[in-house]
Amino acid sequence: MRKRIWVGLPLALVFGGIFAFHTVFHIPEQPEMTTISDGSFNQQLHCYESSTRASIDQEGSLNLLVWNIYKQNRANWQSVLTQMSAGAQLILLQEASLEDGLKRWIASGGWSGEQVNAFKAFDKAAGVLTLGWRKPRLACGYTQLEPWIRLPKSGLYSEYLLSDGQMLIVVNLHAVNFTWGVQEYQQQVNDLIAALKEHPGPAIVAGDFNTWSEKRLQAVTERLENAGLIEVVFSPDQRTRFITGLPLDHVFYKGLEVQKAEAPQTDASDHNPLLVSFTLPTDK
């Protein structure tokens, strides 16, 4: 009798864990995107297109905020987000949870945007969120499953018009974290930057790359450099770093000019934000 109990207990724990996982987490079969416009939030599958003719830059200037916002778990996230986004035309957030507080903040600022729902926990979506003061012409969501914990990370590919007539590609990435090698990591990066090699115009690839090892950092750097992108250098550089000393968050770009780049420190998230001021090329 005691032997049967010991045999049955592990099975009960396994099935109990599976039941609890599926009770807490909802993982969509394909990328689900929420589109945000004029204070409205609407569900859209995979891709979104618009006919906007408005340019994302402001008279040749483009200010960018990139930040893993830690699902807004810190009490001061809103005040810091307001401060850091002042003057920005483009915001790339990772681990953004579309709860009421963030929705109100987006609506009050008149932002347009898209969020890719990586998964829902207790019926609250979390994933990458790209916000702009103008709509994109195209936005497509991507997800890559974490091989160990079976929760996906998300990415968002967007195209914005620029005032000089060019098209700006923007990739907002939250890279997979828990992998034994770099195969899944490389696949996620490859999927999101596939169009960059064929794109002659400007591009920005930014987010939480989870580059906690030299192999990961080399894998992403080589692929982006092969696509013609350069990494932004920050000063001051208070980017969040792993115990290896490697930074986790990055901004890569091409076809633009960097005027200022800083990574200030904050306690409003477990990651520090990245602020970059770009201008359109003057020699075009």
UniProtKB/Swiss-Prot annotation:
Cellular component annotations (GO), alphabetically ordered: cytoplasm
Protein's cellular compartments: Cytoplasm
Pfam families registered for this protein in UniProt: Exo_endo_phos (PF03372)
Transmembrane segments: none
Major localization listed first in the record, in broad terms: cytoplasm
GO MF annotation, one: catalytic activity
HAMAP family in the cross-refs: UPF0294
Designated name of the protein: UPF0294 protein VV1_1880
